[in-house]
């Protein structure tokens, strides 16, 4: 697995964990938990690739990985829509800024996972 991809993903998670949204912090903590889950999933795929040493062998051996990856993309799309919705309904400008930052980070996470998935295809 590309070490730059791993460190970039970890940086995104670190920045997300440092965000404080006041009354919305519970929502953010739930999102961070889901980000951690996505990171663990992505890392487990990377470890499987390293153990196998052959992407084609991994693909033929594990026919469910595409379905799992699709589910993770659905999860992150849902998170993006949830943040967009919260951004629209929030009237506090400080929280709006934080949700805009969260949205930007979510889009970065989606890009990281997409990049990694293309490595598996």
UniProtKB/Swiss-Prot annotation:
One of its GO terms (biological process) is exit of virus from host cell nucleus through nuclear pore. Keywords: Host nucleus, Host-virus interaction, Transport, Virion. GO terms for cellular component: host cell nucleus; virion component. A motif (Nuclear export signal) lies at residues 12-21, 85-94. InterPro entries: Flu_NS2. It is found in: Virion; Host nucleus. SUPFAM superfamilies: Nonstructural protein ns2, Nep, M1-binding domain. Average number present in a viral particle is estimated to be 130-200 molecules. Belongs to the influenza viruses NEP family. Mediates the nuclear export of encapsidated genomic RNAs (ribonucleoproteins, RNPs). Acts as an adapter between viral RNPs complexes and the nuclear export machinery of the cell. Possesses no intrinsic RNA-binding activity, but includes a C-terminal M1-binding domain. This domain is believed to allow recognition of RNPs bound to the protein M1. Interacts with protein M1. May interact with host nucleoporin RAB/HRB and exportin XPO1/CRM1. This is Nuclear export protein. The lineage of its organism: Viruses, Riboviria, Orthornavirae, Negarnaviricota, Polyploviricotina.
């Amino acid at each position: 697995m590309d070490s730059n991809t791993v460190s970039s993903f970890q940086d995104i998670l670190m920045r997300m964990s440092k965000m404080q949204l006041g009354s919305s912090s519970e929502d953010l903590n739930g999102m961070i938990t889901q980000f951690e889950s996505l990171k663990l999933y992505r890392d487990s795929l990377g470890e499987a690739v390293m153990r196998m040493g052959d992407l084609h062998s991994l693909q033929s051996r594990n026919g469910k990985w595409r379905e799992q990856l699709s589910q993770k993309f659905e999860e992150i799309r849902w998170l993006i829509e949830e943040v967009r919705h919260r951004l629209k309904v929030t009237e506090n400008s400080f929280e709006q800024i934080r949700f805009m930052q969260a949205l930007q980070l979510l889009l970065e996470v989606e890009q990281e996972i997409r990049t990694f998935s293309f490595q598996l295809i």
